[in-house]
Amino acid sequence: MRWARLIERGPVLDVASGSGRHAALLAERGFAVLAVDKGDPVSGPGIEFVKANLEDGSPWPFAGRRFAGIVVTNYLHRPLLPILVESLEEGGVLIYETFMLGNERYGRPSNPHFLLRPGELLEAFSALTIVAFEQGVQERPKKAVVQRICVLRGPAGSVKIDP
């Protein structure tokens, strides 16, 4: 999570947290982290876990809440994209990375419903300030075609970038 350093405060929402690797990393930085997943609970100091299926039509479990950071990796449920935009507080950072079309050459996911179209994250988060965007083949940890974006709710001049 190369851009995690741009998250300067909590609370941070880890969507589809899986084993909790990102939640743990962010909690180690001192942030209050809310991890949500339909699977087994994630635990650790600074981590609150909410068990929820985000795809079954239930209401968004965090209605009215805003987050200083939102992290989503290896997960795509398109109806959540505008909800994530609404859930990001002023000055907040959203980091999203998942597979895109072309990944079927390397393995799963291969169903187009679970693969982003070229530039799709740019479109989905166009109301926010783009800090960084990448799409293409990654070699590690396993070869895959991915798309990743880091966006900010606020002016671009408030982000410190590396030279």
What are the residue ranges of the model-derived segments?
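Class I SAM-dependent methyltransferase SAM/SAH-binding core
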Residues: 13, 19-56
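Helix-to-beta-strand junctions that scaffold the AdoMet/dcAdoMet cofactor pocket
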Residues: 88-89
